[in-house]
Amino acid sequence: MRFTTRVVLILFAGSLTTHAFVTYVNNAGNVLRWNLVSPNPSVHTNVVNRNTKAIRYFIASDTYSSANRTAEINAVRACFAQWQSVPGTILKFEEGGFAGPGVDINAGDSIRADHTNVVFWAKRSTLVNGGRDDISGLRGYTLTAFSNDNTILEADIVLNAVEFEWFTDINDTANASQLVEATLLHEIGHFIGLDHSPVGGATVAIGAPGVGAEAGLSSDEVAAVRWLYPQPFLLSTLGSVQGRVLMNGAAVFGAMVTAENAAGNVVAGTVSRANGSYELPALPPGNYKIRVTPLDPSTASDTASLIRGIDIAADYEFAVTSFLPTTNKPIALVGGLTSTLDFSVVGGNPPFRITGISAPSDHPDADTGDRFAAVISSGQSNFFVGVVSTTLPTNGATLTVTGDGITIGPTIFKPFRFLDGRHLLSAVINVAANATPGLRSFVVQQGNNLAYANGYLEVLPPFADFNFDGFDDSFQRKFFPLFTAPEARPDADPDQDGFSNRYEHDTGTDPTNSQSLYFRIESLKVTSAGSTITWQSASGKRYQVFSRPDVPNSSWQPVGLPIVARGSTSQLLDPSAASAIRFYRVQQLP
């Protein structure tokens, strides 16, 4: 039995196998994951429910704060629900209840084991796991225990409330504290078997505080869950690409391999293993561009690096980083088939690297140089974006952003923009309203020399849909304490007024209040035959039209019998109104 002692897996690089996302596969070919098809008898029933085949989790009753306790509990629930909601998977979670105050991580400790997957905030000390581990400097920390066949047996997650402040309101975009739904979503990635992703805007990547790209699962995590926990026959509908990365005929370990779709979005990224091989599985069929780029040296500081081997996992500390990035190679992926695409890279230190991102701003001098992915909304225009490094060219280079719906102005050079000597290359960017949402990449080119920041700019969709139900999360969050709850689903009718949440969203009414109704009368046409009333409706619902004459204190009288709507609009002809002024109203019936 082997155990993890870090947020990422501490394993030997020589035995490592990776996929599009980063997982651990042992020498026997076993993938690190929960066995939800035929749960291992050695896994306690308090950890995995063998009847429902769901991973059970418990939330510590003493949350981060007492004032915001309910929202914090619901944020934890929402994170598990988002992972479970990825279409086409068997991944399932169920809440087991609350764990008592003072709980600790102890997965795999034969003496202290409690057979409980727990999520809690450490509030008194950064020493956890019985004092064995210090989480100082870490926002979150996940410990998993797994058997020799790589079956996860138990896992615990702790969030650091000693050194960090936490909040739950995803609309509070100015808050620089830690968003529960970002960090915990990241940690659950480790909880189910993932290491850090090399894709900048992935959830299981190095994320920024506050509300940013880490919130909501990326295409990289979607591919990961579909590969680790697929429904029967799912993988036969998805494509894969594999190959080797070589330099002078020798294997290149730890090279980043990135798949970019036809829209210019990074859909998956991985790193090559010790024999130079890589695999990008569980990708939707279609046309892709694949490229290979070096990670930054593990000896580089945070400000002198964007993504290092040690940022992915300790196993990649000695990743080969002295080779030049490649150009893109096109490939068409077909469902149920694995294509092969090999790369031969050229040795040598890249002339320049990107080691920081300047987040979008409408101010020309609001420059930043963080290691985190940035976000921009579709339809935004005249925003400055940029990349940072001490090695970037100070002239004669071009900054571009991949993908459709993007126009970018001339490159602006700001040598020594930062006190530590880093240069800035920036440009004005415009994002079309119909730009395909997803993770874009920054590219700097000078002659034949290239540098990439893969997936470090997220183009946001018109509305967030973190739980993959095709419905606007903001509406669900506004009216439901837990936006992933069954009663918040688009076709649910929690107030039992006969209208679904989706209909009430479209008409601007409150789905939790049966007295909140709205269906507009769209037109009233008077002819010799009478008055024709047309109003908005919901198919299958019953409506009654009422009218009254233009006489003071007159009462409303029904016009004809109730009508059952057959579409989004309904009509009624009132023949009695051919020669008199009348007022109309429409009432939805139970």
Walk through the language-model features, giving the residues of each.
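Disordered inhibitory propeptide/activation segment of secreted metzincin zinc metalloprotease zymogens
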Residues: 18-69, 125-152, 234, 318-325, ...
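A short, amphipathic beta-strand motif
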Residues: 239-247, 276, 343
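Short, composition-biased motifs enriched in small/polar/acidic residues
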Residues: 462-590
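Beta-strand/beta-sandwich contexts
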Residues: 348-401, 411, 449-464
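Metzincin-family zinc-dependent endopeptidase catalytic domain
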Residues: 22-29, 72-187, 191-195, 256, ...
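Short, ordered, surface-exposed loop/turn motifs in non-cytosolic proteins
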Residues: 241, 247-270, 284-287
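Structured interaction patches on ligand/partner-binding surfaces of diverse proteins
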Residues: 295-340, 563-565
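Immunoglobulin-like IPT/TIG beta-sandwich domains and homologous Ig-like subdomains
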Residues: 378-448
